[in-house]
Amino acid sequence: MNIRYLLLLSLMPHLVWAAEEPTPEIPFSQCLIEPPVSRSFDDRAQLTDIDPNDIVIISDRTDASFNKQAHFDGDVSFSQGQRHIAADKATLDQRQQQLSATGNLIFKDENITVTADTLEAQMSSNSATLDNTQYWLHGQQVHGKASKMQITSENNLLLSNANFTTCPPGDESWLLEAELIKIDSKEEWGEIWNAKLRIADVPVLYIPYMTVPVSDKRKTGFLFPNFSTSTTNGVQVSTPYYWNIAPEYDLTFTPDMMSSRGLFTKTQVNYLAGEAQQGQVNFEYLDNDNKLAGSPNRYLYNMSHQGAINDNWRVQANFTDVSDNNYFNDLNSDVNRSTDNQLSRIGETSYFERNWDMSVRVQDIKVLGESEKPYQVMPQLNFNYRVADIWQAIDFNFNSELTNFEHQDDNRNTATRIHLVPSLVWPIQGPAGSFTSELKLLQTQFFQQTQDSNNPYNQDVSRTIPQLRLHGKVNFERPANIWGEAYRQTIEPQVQYLYVGYEDQSNIGFYDTAQLQDDYFGLFRDRRFSGHDRIADANQATVGLTSRLLDASNREQFKFSIGQTLYIEDSKVLLNQGLRDAQQSASVLAAELDARLYQDWFISGAVQHDTEHGKNKKSEVTLDYRPSNDKLLQFSYRFVPDLLNTNTNGRVNISQMGVRTSWPLTDSLYFVGNWYHDLKEERDVETYTGIQYESCCWAVRLSYHYRIKTNYDDELMASIDNREEFEKGVYLNFVIKGLGGSGPLGVSDMLDEGLFNYRKPLYLRN
């Protein structure tokens, strides 16, 4: 029979690792390796009212005397809290505070399971030694063997003549053998001495010393290298090194050796500031670019910071600069994509209260490849105040802005602009619709200065413009049966009348104004231009209609919107009077569609059609097939005629089609590819193909790309050095899970590779 021997004194050593966080869930596609479990571990669960610090000993036979030796024989089980030992035989010397166990021995706690031939534990020092062991780290997929395992008084592990792997039993994809392994339970990382790495049971690498993480905690060390080759940079090898400086700081340093250009180094520092602020600092440097005439030095530095100081204050800052216009086009930066041609430098501090807020902002935007430089905002002050229901459900809003515009060119005029907008809003809301009346007064004062007295903008200008906006919307709905499916159909007509007074603004310079898009939702805006340099006069009515289909679970399956603005009077204010179009009686007809065609097929599209001239101003359509989260097939087409090319100041027509896919070929093999073709130029714009294989303990990705390059004229390289128009190359990523890398590599980031990264184009509310 079983004999339960309850010791009220905690004589058992604490053979357990410190854990700051619960064991994380194992990521998708990892293989769970189950350690052995003794049936006697479940016996303690049958006992009730036992203090977790008490030791429970269960065995078939026992011979014990108080304060002397106790011998246990037959299916022995020691338990204390989450710590368990199972063995055939055990001896507890209470006087010497020693425990020994032999025969089918299993030790288990919440972090590790160990099998061994023998165990010798010294309870006074909380240490133990196990011989001929096999171990499994819970939740980490790490397991291995050791001729001897020592558990120190600091709860660390010392493994002699040991090995470990993350592959399942019988899989010899990789194995690390070492003379000594030390695992720090507090820091959750391991040190390894005199190690050999075996791949497919073949020794391929000797490592005198290395460190590896044994959990998801950050750990200093080398990450796996990346290999690539391209016509732009030649053979490229990146070997990132991660430095865990402190809990709130870390640094990644990446030497990137390129055969065509030289050594390119990238440094990234991440930090936390307080409880709600974070930031990042980047510095990239290429000394003497061998591929360019004159071998110039090329560099990038970036700083970004954002967060909340307290409940009221917010801060944001972002600054980036590069050595030349083609930096992102030539080099694989960690900060921006190769298609980015703007560098935003912004600093902003904001303060929020319930009825008001204020902010101070500075901004400088650098446009790569552009000779025309935008104005700098130095600074801008915003103050907004709002009061709900001041009288008869009428809301009062007051928005104000003071902006000082500077320019790098001393010959350009500068200005200070004060813009004040008091408004009264009367919103009427009901279950079947809404109607909003809005009255604004747009008051703007410009203080303009220039070195040229003949400049028409060298004067102060005051502008006062009234604005009236009436917007109404009605919601109709009814049950509908389509192809045997029950839906709820809505019809949502909306009408807007907009009146904006006219004032001559030809004596005001252009500082931050641009034309806004005329998409469906843009038709119902109360402004035609961004910024406040130009306020377009308007006397117009906009009509629109939206229809939706919602299923029994209230998920949106279909949405179609169409609308147009009718001009009662022609607008006299244009961005460029020399480009005035023939007077039109209406805007473009804008339509948008998002729908689930059938089960896993989705379509999304938009069109802007000039009804007076019968021309298509802009159109795009996307067809998606998404049978599951890891399966995607997307077809797309877009058409934009007469688009301004800012590099040449000429006009181009864009007619482009594309295909993108992500598909698992097997449980372990993924394929990602995309292809975009310019129908107008009859050439491929981009081709990308990637194959990724992932097993339980290693992963590899091989990809090929071919893309058009955007080469800018550059003062650093005036001749453009005979730059190639297209770039092609091959990339290789390899990860051994458990040796400085973690899996999976990720298919989603492959979708973001290339010029046209994947976006889900549908806006269905489901």
Curated annotation (Swiss-Prot):
Protein name: LPS-assembly protein LptD
UniProt similarity note: Belongs to the LptD family.
GO cellular component, one term: transporter complex
Organism: Shewanella denitrificans (strain OS217 / ATCC BAA-1090 / DSM 15013)
Annotated localization: Cell outer membrane
Keyword Cell wall biogenesis/degradation appears in the UniProt entry: no
Gene Ontology biological-process entries: Gram-negative-bacterium-type cell outer membrane assembly; lipopolysaccharide transport
Principal location: membrane
Organism superkingdom: Bacteria
Function according to Swiss-Prot or TrEMBL: Together with LptE, is involved in the assembly of lipopolysaccharide (LPS) at the surface of the outer membrane.
Pfam families: LptD, LptD_N
InterPro entries, A to Z: LipoPS_assembly_LptD, LptD, LptD_C, OstA-like_N
UniProt xrefs under Gene3D superfamilies: Lipopolysaccharide (LPS) transport protein A like domain (2.60.450.10)
